[in-house]
A protein has these predicted regions:
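Secondary-structure junction/capping motif
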Residues: 2, 40-44, 176-184
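Core segments of small alpha/beta cavity-forming domains
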Residues: 24-110
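Generic detector of low-complexity/intrinsically disordered segments
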Residues: 5-6, 21, 51
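Low-complexity, intrinsically disordered terminal/linker segments enriched in charged
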Residues: 132-156, 162, 170-186
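Surface-exposed, charged secondary-structure patches
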Residues: 83-149
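Short acidic, low-complexity intrinsically disordered linear motifs used
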Residues: 1-11
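N-terminal intrinsically disordered, low-complexity tails
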Residues: 10-27
């Protein structure tokens, strides 16, 4: 019976365990399309982006765990007490995270959370990161990671410099072996 429960029983809730942030220095970053004169900006820009994406990821994981605790198994399709307030809190905190780092923080802002969280792939050692910079005020960071069963998904972040700070101008997603990029929310 224990073997049956191990495979088909209730899954343990591991969404509460604390994750540590991945350092940009620990990631595999390809810079082959970046001229040498911009290489000194790689660590600054990639570290900025990865740090902010992980902040968003931790928020999503926290809200998801709290949402699961509100669920009532007897009424799985009903809005539970506290759920509306949780969504409001998520939206406010999400906006608070994005406002200082994005040119248009409300454009296509996230309206969902889940498990795994959107940027969990950053802690996967197989994730590839490409740093592309051809002008001093604009950089592109692309990530490639396995999603699901063998599907390789890509994210593309375009960052621009405003005064002395880098900000995310846009985010797109795509799939391996495709040249098309689709607009996406940060």
């Amino acid at each position: 019976m224990r073997l049956f429960s191990q495979f088909f029983g209730k899954k343990s809730d591991n969404s509460n365990h604390k994750l540590s942030k991945v350092s940009a220095k620990d990631l595999n970053i390809t810079t082959s399309e970046t001229p040498e004169k911009f290489m000194h900006l790689k660590d600054e820009i990639v570290a900025f982006l990865i740090d902010k994406l992980q902040d968003i990821n931790f928020l999503e994981r926290e809200i998801f765990a709290r949402s699961q605790k509100l669920k009532n198994p007897k009424e799985p399709n009903q809005v539970q007490p506290g759920e509306t307030e949780l969504w409001d809190e998520y939206a406010a905190r999400y906006k608070e995270l994005l406002t200082p780092i994005a040119f248009n923080p409300l454009a296509g802002s996230s309206n969902s959370f889940g498990n795994p969280a959107k940027y969990d792939y950053l802690s996967n050692p197989d994730t590839e990161i490409f740093f592309i910079m051809k002008s001093s005020n604009r950089a592109v960071v692309e990530t490639r990671y396995k999603y699901g069963i063998g599907v390789v998904q890509k994210h593309q972040f375009v960052l621009k410099k405003e005064a002395e700070n880098w900000k995310i101008e846009s985010k797109k997603y795509g799939f391996e072996n495709e040249t098309t990029w689709y607009k996406d929310a940060i």
